[in-house]
């Protein structure tokens, strides 16, 4: 599958706590926010990544905050895709 570049902005964070903090900031700015976090389940993350980004676009989400997985194995591939999605939406 080609790299999907969502219409919403994608921001990357290291931890769920960082995601919650950033969500609070964005919600206070009247942004519609979704957190993308699979709690360390990289297989589910990989399988659902593009579907969740498309769903965010269809739901009118302004910003997706993605908790990035560890940079090993499948996690590395997910990080690469999220980095590309983030770069494409933060120009």
Residue ranges, per PLM feature:
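A C-terminal functional module that forms or caps the active site or interfaces directly
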Residues: 1-91
């Amino acid at each position: 599958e080609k790299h999907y570049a969502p219409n919403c902005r994608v921001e990357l964070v290291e931890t769920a706590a960082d995601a919650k903090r950033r969500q609070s900031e964005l919600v206070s700015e009247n942004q519609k926010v979704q957190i993308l976090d699979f709690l360390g389940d990289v297989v589910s993350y990989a399988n659902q990544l593009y579907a969740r980004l498309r769903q965010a676009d269809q739901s009118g989400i302004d910003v997706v905050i993605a908790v990035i997985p560890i940079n090993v194995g499948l996690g590395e591939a997910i990080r690469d895709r999220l980095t590309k999605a983030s770069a494409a939406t933060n120009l």
